[in-house]
């Protein structure tokens, strides 16, 4: 009986032509969403490439100028700060680009990428934590978010599922067909589950075909990224299954189509909109982040105080670091103007460290709060994992920020001892300047835990549906 039921359900769906319409509609939406994501990725890669090309050009110019001065083909400038061999010139004018390259699936989810910059250029002067890691963006766009594949899957796909499953039982009941159907030896539970299963298979196929086609159209290799795409489908299909089962439970109550629609939309609002908003707001309330403006202000105040006592601080610094003390005190160091900065920077950093630590701890607590409570909503689980797959999660940008700070110390560490030794740059040394390679392997991946959370929701809804069916059938409430 169930086989006949599925067969005739398929024939009915095909005759209504909604499968073709759904395929075209969802493919169009998916293609548009992936196009939007691809545009952002292309802009991101273009901006990084431009900065990297500037560095290559500057290196070539410095190398040529240094070689010309060294070989006396060109007279050295009278002022040291104009000399191409000056370490301070290279350290300030030709900083390396610390870039956060986009991963292949970055076009899937915008995540935090519209809030943070994807590259930084630490210099010899200034501290890395004072760099601007925030991107200048249209505030209206930030308010409404980005229409990407993640948005389609998290917000629109559940509505599509509910639209084609809210009245499966009620429509037949209202038309009088249901009594004829149940004159056959089949339970309402099996009958309804089989019809929803068919719709799930159809919609899942449409989703997978649309997503793969859109990714291929915009140059994402399925073979090279098979593992990531498989994870994407595992998450999205589990998310869809959850919403089909929610519709299954609501249909089991045997209410009218209008009642079902209102109930399902209410569940969507709570799960997709309300719970994530409440968690986000509570994280900001419970763990407020200190003002970044105040942190930079404190840094500048400490810097101004250090400037007043620069000479004394430098003498103390030489006592603490005798290896950097000048060996020939009769010769003036051409970098004297910046050596006092190096000496005072440690003092300044120590004065602002408590504020910086408080800032980092508050951010960490906020993220921990959200991570722990993400299991309250499958929408948060899906968003979290899609951001991980796209490399646009909060954790990815926090890791990038830390890498910038570490490389800033490496950059200074290369030039600082040489400046204290009053050295100059040689043409052949330009190739030995430190470079940075971004690596996000240390960023924690939440795929396994998020998928487990999604599966838990699926089994919880299944258990709820069976409990409701048994209870209502025994009580005689579930009437056909």
Feature names for model-found ranges:
Residues 145-171, 175:
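Long, hydrophobic alpha-helical segments
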Residues 149-156, 165, 233-238, 452-456:
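Hydrophobic alpha-helical transmembrane segments of multi-pass membrane proteins
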Residues 161-165, 246, 464-468:
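Hydrophobic/aromatic residues in alpha-helical transmembrane segments
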Residues 4-5, 14, 163-204, 472-479:
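Helix-loop-helix units of permease transmembrane domains in multi-pass membrane transporters
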Residues 18, 157, 188-217, 455:
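Selective transmembrane-helix segments that form parts of the transport pathway or gating/packing helices
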Residues 29-41, 54-60, 133, 139-148, ...:
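Secretory targeting signals
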Residues 1-140, 268-480:
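Transmembrane alpha-helical segments and their membrane-interface loop/helix boundaries
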Residues 16, 21, 237-275:
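A structural motif at transmembrane helix-loop-helix junctions in multipass membrane proteins
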